[in-house]
């Protein structure tokens, strides 16, 4: 039995019923799937029944195991195994063709990889397993205390849903937290709405103290923020988690020149 490595945040999924539910949730028309962290290949095996698969694996010790297990699929070109850290492979895309991402993500890189995938124009959407708390942040709605910059970014371009929870006992070794599988299906790209790097910097400021008032977090631009809040009919003491995506875009529109200048001056 291969031992999971802590430095890669490995927890091997061993519950076959969870694998089946993940496969069932993948949109039927997806025929080019990318998997991050195939591990021992249990999910990969099921994915190959419905699509060609390109998998990114960082662990040296798992590469020969996967090559042996999927020798036929590798030889016929249905499976492509890349020995690389996937978080460094967005260059700018994980694949030259449109793809759908499926992954059991290590908790320590989950948010980074999901955001990279959302920014990747070739990514059509993703079904990923992550820490339940992380899934809640990506799928939260305005008004919910969990609504954060991650929720704003995903809501801008995706249909979002937490599909189901996954108990620690479904893994070897069992993690110390509850996991969840979420679906993020893209409906548009960021560049249809804004300049994403500047907008992310804006959101970082908006949520730097999430329980404080938005006006306090954006005090550098207090006069402009007061003006736009008044124009939009929003109260001055509104907090970041109470504002919907459309309103964030409208507030940003009044401040985008400031954030563009900030980026250029870096």
UniProtKB/Swiss-Prot annotation:
Q: Name one Pfam family in it.
A: RrnaAD
Keywords of the record, alphabetical order, are: Cytoplasm, Methyltransferase, RNA-binding, rRNA processing, S-adenosyl-L-methionine, Transferase
EC number(s) per entry: 2.1.1.182
Report the GO terms under cellular component.
cytosol
Q: What is this protein called?
A: Ribosomal RNA small subunit methyltransferase A
Task: Write out the function statement from the record.
Answer: Specifically dimethylates two adjacent adenosines (A1518 and A1519) in the loop of a conserved hairpin near the 3'-end of 16S rRNA in the 30S particle. May play a critical role in biogenesis of 30S subunits.
Q: Which organism is it from?
A: Campylobacter jejuni subsp. jejuni serotype O:2 (strain ATCC 700819 / NCTC 11168)
List, alphabetically, the HAMAP family matched.
16SrRNA_methyltr_A (MF_00607)
């Amino acid at each position: 039995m291969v031992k999971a490595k802590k430095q890669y945040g490995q927890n091997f999924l061993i519950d076959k019923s969870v694998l089946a539910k993940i496969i069932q949730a993948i949109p039927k028309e997806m025929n080019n799937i990318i998997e991050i962290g195939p591990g021992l290949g249990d999910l990969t095996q099921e994915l190959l029944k419905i699509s060609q698969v390109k998998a990114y694996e960082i662990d040296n010790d798992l590469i020969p195991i996967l090559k042996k297990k999927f020798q036929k699929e590798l030889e016929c070109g249905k499976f492509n195994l890349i020995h690389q850290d996937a978080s460094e492979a967005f260059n700018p895309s994980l694949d030259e063709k449109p793809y759908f991402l499926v992954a059991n993500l290590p908790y320590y890189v989950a948010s980074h990889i999901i955001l990279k995938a959302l920014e990747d124009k070739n990514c059509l959407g993703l079904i990923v397993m992550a820490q339940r708390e992380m899934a809640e942040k990506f799928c939260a709605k305005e008004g919910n205390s969990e609504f954060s910059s991650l929720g704003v970014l995903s809501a801008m371009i995706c249909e979002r849903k937490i599909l189901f929870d996954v108990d620690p006992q479904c893994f070897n070794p069992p993690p110390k937290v509850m996991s969840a599988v979420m679906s993020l299906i893209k409906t548009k790209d960021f560049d249809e709405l804004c300049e994403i790097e500047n907008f992310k910097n804006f959101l970082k400021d908006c949520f730097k103290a999430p329980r404080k008032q938005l006006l306090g977090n954006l005090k550098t631009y207090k006069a402009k923020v007061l003006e736009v809040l008044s124009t939009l009919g929003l109260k001055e003491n509104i907090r970041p988690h109470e504002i919907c995506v459309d309103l964030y875009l409208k507030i940003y529109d009044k401040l985008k020149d400031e954030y563009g200048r900030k980026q250029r001056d870096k």
